[in-house]
């Protein structure tokens, strides 16, 4: 199955990136969370949202509803530009993307252990090193039918993004080799 020919023949079948979600679990609030906010906003160009602890854990000195992490959702051109930088950092850390990182709808996740692997980031001893998880969600044109308020309809199975399509898209657009399990 050649996806490139199918995408040229039918442009509505070509997948696109719906959103890129960046998650950073700091594990504690205070100064460490504030510096992590600065780091992640510098990398992404957007202000992060704080995530709260779901339960109390006295061993780690965490109380329920205490901010302990950050998340940012990127869409459109910002998401594509960030993903290029993220793949640069991912390959710089010597990691590989495997097929088991993709779900059946083509969405995938990967982690970056050190933020200093990103372009234009330097190590600062006062800041430290932060890692992050990056989740990429795919869709095809026409998904607004599923989200709209009036005359909402389901997307047929043939129009959903498959795992193979997403892998092919990542390999052709970003030049990342996806390894078999």
Swiss-Prot record:
GO terms for biological process: translation. The keyword RNA-binding applies. PROSITE patterns: RIBOSOMAL_L5 (PS00358). It holds the Pfam family Ribosomal_L5_C. One of its GO terms (molecular function) is structural constituent of ribosome. InterPro entries: Ribosomal_uL5 (IPR002132), Ribosomal_uL5_arc (IPR022804), Ribosomal_uL5_C (IPR031309), Ribosomal_uL5_CS (IPR020929), Ribosomal_uL5_dom_sf (IPR022803), Ribosomal_uL5_N (IPR031310). Signal peptide: none annotated. One of its GO terms (cellular component) is ribonucleoprotein complex. Keywords: Ribonucleoprotein, Ribosomal protein, RNA-binding, rRNA-binding, tRNA-binding. Transmembrane segments: none annotated. NCBIfam families: PRK04219.1. Part of the 50S ribosomal subunit; contacts the 5S rRNA and probably tRNA. Forms a bridge to the 30S subunit in the 70S ribosome. Belongs to the universal ribosomal protein uL5 family. This is one of the proteins that bind and probably mediate the attachment of the 5S RNA into the large ribosomal subunit, where it forms part of the central protuberance. In the 70S ribosome it contacts protein S13 of the 30S subunit (bridge B1b), connecting the 2 subunits; this bridge is implicated in subunit movement. May contact the P site tRNA; the 5S rRNA and some of its associated proteins might help stabilize positioning of ribosome-bound tRNAs. This is Large ribosomal subunit protein uL5. It comes from Methanococcus aeolicus (strain ATCC BAA-1280 / DSM 17508 / OCM 812 / Nankai-3). The lineage of its organism: Archaea, Methanobacteriati, Methanobacteriota, Methanomada group, Methanococci.
């Amino acid at each position: 199955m050649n996806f490139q020919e199918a995408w040229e023949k039918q442009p509505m079948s070509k997948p696109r990136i719906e959103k890129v979600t960046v998650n950073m679990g700091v594990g504690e609030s205070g100064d460490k969370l504030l510096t992590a906010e600065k780091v992640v906003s510098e990398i992404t160009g957007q202000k992060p949202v704080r995530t709260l602890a779901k339960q109390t854990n006295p061993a780690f000195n965490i109380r329920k509803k205490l901010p302990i992490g950050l998340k940012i959702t990127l869409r459109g051109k910002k998401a594509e530009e960030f993903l290029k930088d993220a793949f640069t950092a991912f390959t710089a850390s010597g990691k590989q993307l495997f097929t088991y990182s993709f779900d059946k709808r083509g969405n995938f996740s990967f982690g970056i252990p050190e933020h200093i692997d990103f372009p234009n980031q330097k190590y600062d001893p006062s800041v430290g090193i932060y890692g992050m998880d990056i989740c990429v969600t795919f869709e095809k044109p026409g998904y607004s039918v599923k989200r709209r308020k009036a005359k909402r309809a389901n997307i047929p199975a043939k129009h959903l993004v498959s795992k193979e399509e997403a892998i092919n898209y990542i390999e052709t657009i970003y030049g990342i080799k996806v390894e078999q399990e």
